[in-house]
């Protein structure tokens, strides 16, 4: 009987000593989980009749809006500071990344142009070209034409390299001579000109001059016969025998080889044969004439030219040429690199201002508040539990160890009592 009593006593003492460490370990290990659940549970308010039970809903669901504001202030004040946002922007906007993005956009734009079935890009380009020739370029030309040296170098170069060395070829001289003799001064025009010239007064002047200024045999002929009767008869012949007179004039032109002589003379025409002073004056006159014309009529000329051009068709041709241009494809990388460098220089100067202007526009703090408020208490609890289990397991273990140590301390106190 004494042995049974002793065994019971030893078991009771052992249980008294072992229970506090075991209970402390269990309580310490599961305290975090219980505490988290107590913060969130219940998720919604519990009512008895019209009265809400105290401590419902849980602490976090009840103060979720204030918690969202605190989280937003903490993140914006400690994590996403303006300086950190600037560093983030610098990392995102590195030259290589910006260049790659610009190159991608350029390639995308070219591909969009190639896939444009309605020729929208060509229509836009046509409107730009039409405005350029009808409005912008005439105004620019009118403003530039006021300068004294406007197009001076260009006109002088054209004059020296083109006009100064210009000569008619044999074919051009032949065509020009034929045009002069057949259209400008044909035999009929010569006949009528001769009739208009041989007036009575002109015949008298010619006759008197011939009598006064001749000598020797010619003086005898001039004073005995004179030219008056001959010229009058020539005029009468041209008036009365028109067809025959035209034939005779044509024969005279052929016999005198006027066509060949005229062709040779046209071929010999060249500004280089003129004196240097004359050439200089002619160049100056040409420059002033061109400048004066541009000042007075250049704008109207460009406007009229723009109205007569089919800009839509020209734009389509330009776009088709660009789509198959190897130079455009190879130059995209260079263009993107230059644009990236320009953007980098701009950001170096104004990145702080840009970030300061972007923060209110982005409203990151409000985004955080909205996201926290939009998250249900269940999801918040699951997120915190996941963080505790994956990242803060050491705290849970320490809680168990501390609970065990507290239990051991209590057991020691019980033994000494």
UniProtKB/Swiss-Prot annotation:
Membrane topology, from the record: Multi-pass membrane protein
InterPro entries per record: DUF445, UCP032178
Gene Ontology cellular component annotations, sorted alphabetically: plasma membrane
Signal peptide: none
Chief subcellular location: membrane
Pfam families, per database record: DUF445
Keyword Cell inner membrane: yes
Compartments reported by the entry: Cell inner membrane
Transmembrane segments annotated in the record for this chain: 11-31, 395-415
Keywords of the record: Cell inner membrane, Cell membrane, Membrane, Transmembrane, Transmembrane helix
UniProt superkingdom: Bacteria
Family the entry assigns: Belongs to the UPF0754 family.
Protein name in the entry: UPF0754 membrane protein PCC8801_0398
